[in-house]
């Protein structure tokens, strides 16, 4: 499991560490302070670079804004919207989310349907 954020990577790591969940993630990818990686698309491309051994068609983005969904579309990765985040569900569906979940416990079933 990886975290891909448009927020600075080091900030993401500190937040995850603060909540004691950093070790739950195999990779944390975020924006760079030098501006080299800034947009969601650039962050996701960096994920693809770091995880080059994983086929893109085996990846999925779980997001809470239309920007997450649009970024996933730009790198040809399916996306699942969560209804309990910051974004509007209708905007995420319009942007192309393949599914919407209201609870993380729904994720295994939705992933099974998407990848079967």
What are these regions (language model features)?
Residues 22-37:
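A short, structured active-site edge motif that brings together acidic residues
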């Amino acid at each position: 499991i990886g975290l891909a954020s448009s927020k600075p990577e080091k900030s993401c790591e500190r937040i995850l560490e603060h909540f004691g969940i950093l070790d739950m993630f195999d990779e944390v990818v975020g924006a760079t302070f030098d501006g080299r990686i800034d947009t969601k698309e650039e962050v996701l491309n960096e994920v693809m670079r770091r995880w080059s051994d994983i086929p893109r068609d085996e990846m999925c983005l779980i997001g809470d804004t239309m920007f997450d969904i649009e970024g996933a579309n730009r790198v040809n990765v399916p996306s699942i919207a969560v209804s309990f985040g910051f974004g509007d569900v209708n905007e995420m569906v319009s942007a192309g989310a393949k599914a919407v979940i209201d609870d993380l416990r729904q994720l295994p079933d939705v992933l099974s349907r998407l990848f079967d």
